[in-house]
Amino acid sequence: ALFGPKWDLNIPNPADREKMLRHQKKGMQISREFGCVTYTIHVGAYHYCYDRIPLETLRPLAHQALETLIPEAEKLGMIIAVENSFEMPNSAKEVIGLTDPFMSSPAIGLCYDTGHANCMASAPWKKMEEYAPYFPVCWWENGVIPEDGALEKMKDRIVTCHIHDNNGYADLHDMPGDGTIDWNALVPELKSCPNMKEYQTEVGLVGGRNWAGVSAAPAGGYSIRRLVDTFRKLGF
């Protein structure tokens, strides 16, 4: 879907909301013309993290947006997939709660993001002070709250997934195997999701430093060949 602060489900400005809804509908129409079945969208984090608008204000806005967009998705034969991320408004708990009232519709589901879930999962070796600088901003109320078992919680609603790796501290979008995710354990779990429609790579091919941190990619970035070979070895 269209991505960014102006296109999130929970944007508060009325004029921006009207534009967001209109363009998201158009985005679904174009995606369907290209044969897409799912349409992944973010609840939104910018206005919570940087404007510090509380969740109690933002949740109803996201709900209202889905009320408007789901009928369009039903008409097109598409599924809106709400994605888990590493900010409080996009946690697995929040996206499950947001989609709860709409689960009678065939046009709503979830997108499981492997890298986002890895950042939020606890681990014996993790240290809070090692998280990327933007994590405390994303969890400004009570600090970073780990969220374990996101896949299990979301599993029955997952219709698509974003596949990439990281070091557990930053949203680096590295190649599977270059981070801390246990792919031998994760892949069978992904494949057992009963409503999964597709698997998508979200590996960032360009190496070096970006907004999220320093990529694990080699100098010159990841090659398409390595990407294809890696995903084939994983069984995709």
Residue ranges of model-derived segments:
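Histidine-acidic metal/acid-base catalytic patches
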Residues: 25-29, 35-37, 60-63, 89-236
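Short loop/turn segments at strand-loop or loop-helix junctions that form parts
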Residues: 1-5, 41-46, 164-166, 202-205
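Active-site acidic/histidine proton-transfer and metal-coordination neighborhood
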Residues: 4-112, 119
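Residue-level preference for alpha-helix termini and adjacent loops
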Residues: 2, 6-9, 175, 180
